[in-house]
Amino acid sequence: MAAAMMNKTVVVGKESVKGGVAPKVAMSRGGFLNSGIMKKDRDMMVWQPFNNKMFETFSYLPPLTDEQISKQVDYILANSWTPCLEFAASDQAYAGNENCIRMGPVASTYQDNRYWTMWKLPMFGCTDGSQVLSDMQACTKAFPDAYIRLVCFDANRQVQICGFLVHRPPSATDYRLPADRQV
């Protein structure tokens, strides 16, 4: 029986071990083993709950470039969604008790309870991305110290499909690199 066990091969991760008994896998400090692949401790960090404010869809990314915004606008229009620009002062941009309209026992962080000012009307029937981009520039010129976001609506499903920031005030310090958002 012992001789049979000695000839057995056990696979541990990507390595095979002769003798049938797998050695204990040594864990390095700050790492863990997942399917035989060692991960770094930054992959297991805790999300920072303080001063880690987010906006809409792409908040985890660095601020979008003009080219990236243009591609998003093209995607929105290609799907026949209605774009709409909204803006808010820095102190009114985040969901909170001070700038939240209460409709019953709804928490202040519930996103539908926060309203931004609309820039003109939604761009119903818009098929030209340059029109959306020129309105963004006009809104930014009129309100340089405000947050400006682009939201879009699907008329068929009658819902907001997406929303993302297209302008942050120059004084904004809310964006943090993902590595800085963790403890």
From Swiss-Prot:
CDD domains, alphabetized: RuBisCO_small
Alphabetically ordered keywords of this record: Calvin cycle, Carbon dioxide fixation, Chloroplast, Lyase, Monooxygenase, Oxidoreductase, Photorespiration, Photosynthesis, Plastid, Transit peptide
MF-aspect GO terms: monooxygenase activity; ribulose-bisphosphate carboxylase activity
SUPFAM superfamilies named in the record: RuBisCO, small subunit (SSF55239)
Record localization: Plastid, Chloroplast
Keyword presence, Chloroplast: yes
Transit peptide interval: 1-43
A Gene Ontology BP annotation from the UniProt entry: reductive pentose-phosphate cycle
Any coiled-coil regions, as ranges: none
Domain of life: Eukaryota
Xref: Gene3D superfamilies: Ribulose bisphosphate carboxylase, small subunit
Cellular component, GO annotation: chloroplast
Pfam families in the cross-refs: RuBisCO_small
Database matches in InterPro entries: RuBisCO_ssu, RuBisCO_ssu_dom, RuBisCO_ssu_sf
Stated family: Belongs to the RuBisCO small chain family.
Function as written in the Swiss-Prot or TrEMBL entry: RuBisCO catalyzes two reactions: the carboxylation of D-ribulose 1,5-bisphosphate, the primary event in carbon dioxide fixation, as well as the oxidative fragmentation of the pentose substrate. Both reactions occur simultaneously and in competition at the same active site. Although the small subunit is not catalytic it is essential for maximal activity.
Subunit structure: Heterohexadecamer of 8 large and 8 small subunits.
General remark: The basic functional RuBisCO is composed of a large chain homodimer in a 'head-to-tail' conformation. In form I RuBisCO this homodimer is arranged in a barrel-like tetramer with the small subunits forming a tetrameric 'cap' on each end of the 'barrel'.
UniProt name for this protein: Ribulose bisphosphate carboxylase small subunit, chloroplastic 7
Organism: Acetabularia peniculus (Green alga)
Source taxonomy: Eukaryota, Viridiplantae, Chlorophyta, Ulvophyceae, TCBD clade
